[in-house]
Swiss-Prot record:
Organism annotation: Burkholderia cenocepacia (strain HI2424)
SUPFAM superfamilies linked: ALDH-like
Binding site for NAD(+): G221, S222, S223, D224, T225, G226
Enzyme Commission number: 1.2.1.71
GO molecular function: succinylglutamate-semialdehyde dehydrogenase activity
Pathway assignment: Amino-acid degradation; L-arginine degradation via AST pathway; L-glutamate and succinate from L-arginine: step 4/5
Record field: catalytic activity: N-succinyl-L-glutamate 5-semialdehyde + NAD(+) + H2O = N-succinyl-L-glutamate + NADH + 2 H(+)
Full protein name: N-succinylglutamate 5-semialdehyde dehydrogenase
InterPro entries the record matches: Ald_DH/histidinol_DH, Ald_DH_C, Ald_DH_CS_CYS, Ald_DH_CS_GLU, Ald_DH_N, Aldehyde_DH_dom, SuccinylGlu_semiald_DH_AstD
Gene assigned in the entry: astD
Length: 487
């Protein structure tokens, strides 16, 4: 089983065998040997050797290879979408959009590098001031399972464009997608060692994160793991650390004219990707009174009709399975804990089969829960909070250590102006789902939701560092000398 990609070749790992499973059927989706610490060391060494040549390559030449990667992704869209669906449970319709986003990321990343970094010159006395940007060197990229193609791609593409070399450690729950993606890079003509793939579980990740020869670490994943990485690298200022983590995201519902539109956007916010987007709304703030009652009744009615099915079902479902049977069980347990604390189920969650990742979309009213835990339940579990005043809704929405996304559904522009000025989040949407984001805009949040703005336009900022120079083409003695100097 040659599932590692090191120095331009597919090789076997020397660590334990592990497997990924289709969460909708429990069938094995991928199996292979993990990378040991020695394998990780070889991958980092390969990236280090390749760095000089890759970073010295003309910018346009690097971009041509990356553009070929995008073209090949488009050609292989269906095969890669199938790999994504098989390992994650994501319906094919959604997996196809993920592949399209991967390809689109290339043009955006090239534009971002040129506009946010690149090279700038300004004439000055006796010379010219030049701003250039240099790659960091070898960067480790850690990918998540929820978007196993798109999210690591959002680190890898801008890193390569800037001239870095990469060691990629994907989620152990989606290694097959990583293999398929790296095969496309190989066919695109990426030189040996520029991108290396190390498959594995926790030990592989620890070996890579602790390696003394990496110059940067780009991570998308849970806030708990990202916080540990932040602590680990707190004493290593030489490492550039880019973290994109989770959120306990609020969606505030105003008394709108079109209740069905509000319900639609709430369902998209809370349950798209089976609630496994870091920007999904976890807390739904609904006004007290008759309007709020009507909204909740309609929200519950439409939610109760959502069915989850296998990724390639015909007709396609809105939701697939969550990533694993274990993840499904944790969500049901989270609901039970909330109920024990005083929450009232509106649409109760249940796991269809203990061997599979299928749960139904659920709504629980947590208004009466004292000291509501500030936790991200990564799945289709929406928590409703009833509010008396708009200021109360904003105050409670901001009562979180996270700050990734937030949304407002309201007809009044003045209400929106107040909301956007007072809410604390990196992505703030009006009359759009909380998980609606533009790849041409910054993506990321405040607080425990991360630092930098990985995976989108601002990724160029952390993939290269600025180098300032003052230059003159000719060495000459100044016309005016400093006091005390005699020539």
């Amino acid at each position: 089983m040659t599932e590692l990609f090191i120095d331009g070749a597919w090789v076997a790992g020397s660590g334990p065998v592990f497997a990924s499973r289709n969460p909708g059927t429990d069938a094995v989706a991928w199996q292979g040997e993990s990378a040991s610490a020695a394998d990780v060391d070889r991958a980092v060494a390969s990236a280090r050797r390749a760095f000089a040549g890759w970073s010295a390559l003309d910018f346009e030449a690097r971009c041509e290879i990356v553009k070929r990667f995008a073209a090949l992704l488009t050609e292989r869209k269906e095969a890669i979408a199938t790999a994504i669906g098989r390992e994650t449970g994501k319906p094919l319709w959604e997996a196809r959009t993920e592949v399209a986003s991967m390809a689109a990321k290339v043009g955006i990343s090239i534009q971002a590098y040129q506009e946010r970094t690149g090279e700038k010159r300004q004439d000055m006395a006796d010379g010219v001031a030049v701003l250039r940007h240099r790659p960091h060197g070898v960067v480790a990229v850690f990918g998540p399972y929820n978007f196993p193609g798109h999210l690591p791609n959002g680190h890898i593409v801008p890193a390569l464009i800037a001239g870095n070399t990469v060691v990629f450690k994907p989620s152990e729950l989606a290694p097959g997608v990583a293999r398929a993606t790296v095969e496309v890079w190989q066919e695109a003509g990426l030189p040996a060692g520029v991108l290396n793939l190390v498959q594995g579980e926790k030990d592989t990740g620890i070996a890579l994160a602790n390696h003394r020869q990496i110059d940067g670490l780009f991570f998308t994943g849970s806030s708990d793991t990202g916080t540990l990485l932040h602590k680990q690298f707190g004493g290593r200022p030489e490492i550039v650390l880019a973290l994109e983590m989770g959120g306990n995201n609020p969606l505030v519902i105003g008394e709108v004219e079109d209740i069905d539109a509000a319900v639609h956007h709430t369902i998209q916010s809370a349950f798209l990707s089976a609630g496994q987007r870091c920007t999904c709304a976890r807390r739904i703030f609904v006004p007290q009174g008759a309007f709020g009652d009507r909204f909740l009744a309609r929200f519950a009615d439409v939610t109760s009709k959502i069915t989850a099915d296998v990724f390639d079902a015909d007709p396609q479902p809105f939701m697939g399975a969550v990533i694993s049977a274990r993840a499904a069980a944790k969500l049901v347990d989270a609901q039970a804990r909330l109920v024990e604390q005083g929450a009232k189920p509106i649409v109760a969650m249940a796991q269809r089969d203990p061997r599979l990742g299928f749960v139904n979309a659920a709504i629980v009213d947590v208004t009466g829960v004292a000291n509501l835990p500030d936790e991200e339940h990564f799945g289709p579990l929406a928590q409703v909070v009833r509010y008396a005043t708009f200021d109360e809704a904003i105050e409670r929405a901001n009562d979180t250590a996270f700050g990734l996304s937030a949304g407002l559904l309201a007809d009044d522009a003045k209400v929106w102006e107040h909301f956007r000025r007072t809410i604390r989040a990196g992505i703030v949407n009006w009359n759009r789902p909380t998980n609606g984001a533009s790849s041409a805009a910054p993506f990321g949040g405040t607080g425990r939701s991360g630092n930098h703005r990985p995976s989108a336009y601002y990724a160029a900022d952390y993939c290269a560092y600025p180098m300032a120079s003052v230059e003159s083409t000719q060495l000459t003695l100044p016309a005016s000398l400093s006091p005390g100097l005699h020539f």
